[in-house]
């Protein structure tokens, strides 16, 4: 019998190393090997065993052909690239099924009975597991890419691409990623010309903060209309404001008048930052030229996207995801919809015409401004968006609701899952009868959220409301060639 305390522990069942939380032995084909053995290693290591010629990356760099470097990077960034897309979907579907089986098993232990899950029988589950929804596009699907600056295998510090190696082993290099299946040509082109800019710049890149240097990472965002936004991060170190301005002009001239003009950027941003990652509030994005926002047409809405606003990286796949969320939510004219971790507000806005009222909550202030603009531009009048931490805003918002409208909650948190106070607020709000939980990493901290939502009432943890019941699950593939997918879960009570 499983130990529920182990499952509930942060260091427990689903936080083991590896990508999938189980071990099913040694099936014969590659896709089954990925399923069965990733628990002890990774998809990359399993694939490598099928190709003995690729040796394990060593601390001391050894001479290696370009194609081998490219394969190594592909194995890290897109571990499933060697499989057909049909085989990839099989791997992902089985992953979600195993996860849900484990979840149901542990819920049964916690309750001592099986009444915490629905009565359906599907794929060995009591909840209804739908077939995985494939991505409409499988190549070049990313609408946002982040490129690092570091030393190439030949030692050139002005190289733009993705990291390969580990800092612990001291073998990190930076490799161009134009060969990766999920990167659009436009993103690779902008990265290539940023590298050209760096190599002709008199200012050194910032590889490690304590080593000095200035030029840092590049972010590229695109939409389906072909518009391109680039964001360059710069560490000022000891430069004066005037010296920083000179570098901004140099960068702008390169992409407007110089070789980089071929990229045809719609907008170019500059962020001066002394931190690894920071928000617009901490260090404002400075528009060097072009449009301040990028726009996307989605589900009949014109969506505005700011430089640091969250937007699903697979636009075509996101449309399918949002339709499924809307269908599962069952929102109607009597419903109040809470869109928690709403980003630019697309989920709430897309179902607003069916709901009585929509409240969206998002941490990133720029994203909230985008959501408000999108609502106004599209004539949506029954949506309100709130900027701040969900664990602070949600309890206050629920207390302010004086009527007894049936409340539907949709949560789409980051990989870290929901804050405990948010889970507690949802659990203890007796008007919330339907919850749609969207997770891009259901085997991580989100699993803890599922347990807290469905476990028996616990006064010590202030989980006093009736437990939710897992009814349906829909895997949606937004990340072809990687082991990840979105899992949409419907809970009711």
Swiss-Prot record:
The active site is at 440 (nucleophile), 486 (proton acceptor). GO terms for cellular component: mitochondrial matrix; mitochondrion. It is found in: Mitochondrion matrix. One of its GO terms (biological process) is tRNA processing. InterPro entries: Methyltranfer_dom, SAM-dependent_MTases_sf, TRM2_met, TRM2B_chor, U5_MeTrfase_fam. Keywords: Methyltransferase, Mitochondrion, rRNA processing, S-adenosyl-L-methionine, Transferase, Transit peptide, tRNA processing. Its EC number is 2.1.1.35, 2.1.1.-. It catalyses: uridine(54) in tRNA + S-adenosyl-L-methionine = 5-methyluridine(54) in tRNA + S-adenosyl-L-homocysteine + H(+); a uridine in 12S rRNA + S-adenosyl-L-methionine = a 5-methyluridine in 12S rRNA + S-adenosyl-L-homocysteine + H(+). Its main location: mitochondrion. Disulfide bonds: none annotated. Residues 1-14 form a transit peptide. S-adenosyl-L-methionine binds at residues 312, 362, 412. GO terms for molecular function: rRNA (uridine-C5-)-methyltransferase activity; tRNA (uracil(54)-C5)-methyltransferase activity, S-adenosyl methionine-dependent. Belongs to the class I-like SAM-binding methyltransferase superfamily. RNA M5U methyltransferase family. Mitochondrial S-adenosyl-L-methionine-dependent methyltransferase that catalyzes the formation of 5-methyl-uridine in tRNAs and 12S rRNA. Catalyzes the methylation of uridine at position 54 (m5U54) in all tRNAs. Specifically methylates the uridine in position 425 of 12S rRNA (m5U425). Does not affect RNA stability or mitochondrial translation. This is tRNA (uracil-5-)-methyltransferase homolog B. It comes from Mus musculus (Mouse).
């Amino acid at each position: 019998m499983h130990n529920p305390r182990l499952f509930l522990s942060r260091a427990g069942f689903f936080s083991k190393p590896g990508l999938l939380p189980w071990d099913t032995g040694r099936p014969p084909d590659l896709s089954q090997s990925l399923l069965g053995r990733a628990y002890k290693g990774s998809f990359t290591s399993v694939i490598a065993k099928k190709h003995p010629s690729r040796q394990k990356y060593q601390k001391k760099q050894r001479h290696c052909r370009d194609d081998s470097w490219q394969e190594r990077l592909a194995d890290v960034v897109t571990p499933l690239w060697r499989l057909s897309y049909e085989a990839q979907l099989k791997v992902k579907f089985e992953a979600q099924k195993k996860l849900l089986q484990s979840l149901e098993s542990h819920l049964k232990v916690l309750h001592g009975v099986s009444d915490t899950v629905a009565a359906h029988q599907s794929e060995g589950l009591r909840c209804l597991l739908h077939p995985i929804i494939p991505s409409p596009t499988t190549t070049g699907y990313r609408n946002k890419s982040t490129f690092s600056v570091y030393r190439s295998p030949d030692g050139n510090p002005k190289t733009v691409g993705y990291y390969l190696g580990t800092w612990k082993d001291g073998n990190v290099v930076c490799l161009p990623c134009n060969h990766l299946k999920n990167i659009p040509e436009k993103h690779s082109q902008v990265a290539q010309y940023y590298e050209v800019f760096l190599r002709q710049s008199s200012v050194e890149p910032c590889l490690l903060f304590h080593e000095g240097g200035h030029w840092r990472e590049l972010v590229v965002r695109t939409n389906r209309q072909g518009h391109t936004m680039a964001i360059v991060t710069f560490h000022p170190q000891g430069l004066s404001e005037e010296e920083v301005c000179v570098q901004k002009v140099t960068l702008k001239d390169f992409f407007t008048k110089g070789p980089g003009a071929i990229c045809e950027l719609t907008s170019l941003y500059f962020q001066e930052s002394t931190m690894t990652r920071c928000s617009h509030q901490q260090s404002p994005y400075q528009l060097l030229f072009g449009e301040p926002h990028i726009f996307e047409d989605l589900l009949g809405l014109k969506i505005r996207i700011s430089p640091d606003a969250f937007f699903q990286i697979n636009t075509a796949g996101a449309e399918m995801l949002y339709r499924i969320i809307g269908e599962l939510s069952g929102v109607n004219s009597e419903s109040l919809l809470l869109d928690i971790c709403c980003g630019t507000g697309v989920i709430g806005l897309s179902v607003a015409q069916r709901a009585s009222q929509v409240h969206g909550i998002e941490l990133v202030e720029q994203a909230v401004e985008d959501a408000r603009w999108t609502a106004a531009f599209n004539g949506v009048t029954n949506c309100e968006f709130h900027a701040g931490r969900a664990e602070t805003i949600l309890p206050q918002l629920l207390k302010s609701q004086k009527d007894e409208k049936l409340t539907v909650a949709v949560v789409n948190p980051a990989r870290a899952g929901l804050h405990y106070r948010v889970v507690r607020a949802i659990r203890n709000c007796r008007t919330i009868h339907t919850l749609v939980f969207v997770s891009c990493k259901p085997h991580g901290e989100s699993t803890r959220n599922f347990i807290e939502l469905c476990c028996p009432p616990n006064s010590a943890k202030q989980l006093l409301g009736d437990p939710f019941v897992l009814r349906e699950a829909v895997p949606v593939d937004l990340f072809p060639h990687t082991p990840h997918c979105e899992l949409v879960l419907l809970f009711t009570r």
